[in-house]
Amino acid sequence: DGKSIKNKFRTKDLRNTHPFVTKMDEEDFSKGLAGRNIALWQSHGRYFEEKTDRWEWQRAPMFQTVEDMYTQSYVLPFLIPMLENAGAYVMTPRERDPQTNEVISDNDPAFEDGRGEGVRIEGRYSETGTWSDAGIGFADARATYSLLENPFQMGTARQAECRKNHREKAAEARWTPEIPERGEYSVYISYKSLPHSTPCAHYTVRHLGGESEFIVNQKMGGGTWIYIGTFEFDKGSEGCVILDNSVPKGYNVTRDAVITADAVRFGGGMGKIARGLKDQPVNEYTTSGMPSFTEGALYWMQWAGADSTILSKYDNDYTSDYGNRGAWVGWMSGGSRTNPKAEGLNIPIDLSFAFHTDAGTTPNDSIIGTLSIYTLLCDGSDKFANGEDRLQQRMYADFVQTEIVNDIRKEFNPEWSRRGLWDRSYSESRTATVPAMLLELLSHQNFADMKFGLDPSFRFTVSRAVYKGMLKYLSARYGCEYAVQPLPVNSFATSFTGSKSVRLRWKATVDSLEATAVPTGYILQTRIDDGAFDNGRVLDGCKVSGNEISTKVSIVPGHIYSYRVTAFNKGGKSFPSETLSVGVPESGNGKNVLVVNNFTRVSAPAWFDTNEYAGFDASLDAGVPYVKEINFIGPQYQFRRSLPWLDDDNPGFGAAWTNEAGKVFAGNTFDYCGIHGKALMAAGYAFHSSSGGVLRRQDLG
């Protein structure tokens, strides 16, 4: 019912005291995760192995994927967006952006030698008003970084006084990238946290869909990359990020408050950390040659300015990659209310989550299932640094595991196995300094598990279950009510109400697994012609008829208008609907055509199962990803069930090629009506569109 569960671990909720990154004009998700800061990561990643003198995967390539990449297909397209849609700020020690291009705009000059394909592009930085030096900061001084080199110790940062009223001088910093090709690019800002830093730095991102504004609390997070969103940019230099020294309405600053500015980067890029043998000259070290998002956390942490004491805790990259992640959480949260005794970046992290899959097979091909792990004691203590009881991690791990198993049993397999709820001394659940857990969702080595595991619908359901578990745990911890964000709307359709107006209608989707996931409002996003979707606007005065919701919008002849609808409530917003388009030619033949989008399939690849041979056959049917696929590394080549695992290079049954790793494969974008409409308009026809589900129910109206 959305009520908080009573428990002995309840503590005071301070989430609105010092918000970190706030998107302006966002709905108030007071029953969601607004004001919460969550640290999470997905499994392992490509790393340098000294024993073999090569970059390699930390796990065996099996069933068309590898754990290093497989859990990405939950965390990046589903889990992180769900948490962000609920209002959370999510940080991760692995690169989240599969975009292989990367542009760095900075106040310091960048390296000159080593430019070329696959290497970062230098953008432009400019200032207006009065600025001064703010001390040590970022500089992209090397084409590659090795050993413990820290780019956040190689340059400088800038500062300007906050403008408390219109009579004081305005100051502005602007970062302008030279985008090499149109696409989606994550935007990371950086700055310096000083004693008098403002809690309300005002950033504006100009992108193909318009402008997005953010308020960033610069009292925390200084000296690393701070993600603020992913946006579509056109090729060239039309986009930019702007920081100004105004004080946003509703905020107050001290008399000596300052804003600070350092580098901004666009896109994830390619690996830029070089490794080699200890007795090898550093100039002979090599990078992974792969996109940054495929690499382990160790390398992103170095690129993000993590302290050398974190990076050098272990003497090999394999152990350092997973062993340093808890220390990274401690560094990010150090000095905050959740980790008050440590030095760090002062971000009050509410929880930490490690998303893994397990190894192991069953002789009868039954489900291995889901294991949840927490750690009661760290260095002999059952208390966190802020005095809270570490036993609450058991409640957290239980909530998440329960949501996952219950939802899988109801939606996919009633016999899905619930494994243990372990108290074990795993680094990722022991050292994080905040409530933490490690999830082993399923066995990536077990064919029965992976029949479900390669299905995008399964990954959506599991990710939603993890998000619900986190939400309900934090509700219990802080004693606040919760609501789960709605599911995407269905039965979307458009129809003309005149030559310059269109009726949009849809239905809310009932969530049979969650009573609180009921929409209370809707957001409409619009794209005109070949532009990008805008930020959207909340629809006021929608007409409700039975279970159908509708609204009217205006159009201008000669343009194609594309729409998608998002449902929201006090807990957050849904994923967007499919995209429908309409258009009226300026001088047409007066006839209308209905375009029906009936391509709604998402699926796992084809599989077969016999006593001796089994596996996935992508040549027969590669399946259909949701929007895009990032976990496919190559087709399965070993189908003999009898072959055992020998080592990760010879994993036996299920073994897969790896020649496609790091590539992004097209999936179902649910955005096709405009393509057909463009051709129809060229032929003189007006067009509108509908989802296939409406047509199947003969409900076009």
List each model region and its residues.
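Beta-strand-rich modules
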Residues: 552-572
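Short beta-strand-plus-loop segments that form exposed binding edges in beta-rich domains
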Residues: 242-257
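Extracellular carbohydrate recognition and processing domains
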Residues: 208-237
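Aromatic-Pro/Gly-enriched surface loop or interdomain linker
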Residues: 63, 78-86, 94, 579-700
